[in-house]
Amino acid sequence: MKLLIFAVIISVVLFPVLVSSRTIKCDQLSGKCINGEEKEIMNMRLGLDVSSRRILQASRYISYEALKKNLPDNRRGEPDQRDNPYRRSCDVHSHCYRFTN
């Protein structure tokens, strides 16, 4: 037992690189872990900032494709009126479309 303790103490003194602590950082989104080099840590932080900005930017506005959809307002019991008489075209949903088959 004493010999084992002596060997550990000598290895720590002679080879501090073997037992030195390293900073290990993990990316929360991808789950990738890196060693503690400063350059890698900075790159990972920048990547997290960019990806979190993309997520926030994607949820802050309504896309133009969603605004282009021309869907009527279906209210039961209301008289049949065109939903938007200036821009809505005549189609099956607004009940003015004629089937010509």
UniProtKB/Swiss-Prot annotation:
- Kindly list the places in or outside the cell where this protein is found, as annotated in its UniProt entry: Secreted
Q: Which GO terms describe its cellular component?
A: apoplast
Pfam families associated with the record: RALF
Chief subcellular site?
secreted
Disulfide cross-links: C90-C96
Leader sequence range is 1-21
Sites marked Required for proteolytic cleavage: R53, R54
Which residues are in coiled coils?
Answer: none
Its name, as the record gives it, is Protein RALF-like 14
Keyword list (alphabetical) reads:
Disulfide bond, Hormone, Secreted, Signal
The Gene Ontology terms for molecular function here are:
hormone activity
Question: Which positions are cleaved off as the propeptide during maturation?
Answer: 22-56
* Taxonomic lineage: Eukaryota, Viridiplantae, Streptophyta, Embryophyta, Tracheophyta
Post-translational modification (record): Proteolytically cleaved, probably by S1P, a subtilisin-like serine protease (subtilase).
The superkingdom listed in its UniProt entry is Eukaryota
**Family label:** Belongs to the plant rapid alkalinization factor (RALF) family.
* Any GO BP: cell-cell signaling
Q: What does this protein do?
A: Cell signaling peptide that may regulate plant stress, growth, and development. Mediates a rapid alkalinization of extracellular space by mediating a transient increase in the cytoplasmic Ca(2+) concentration leading to a calcium-dependent signaling events through a cell surface receptor and a concomitant activation of some intracellular mitogen-activated protein kinases.
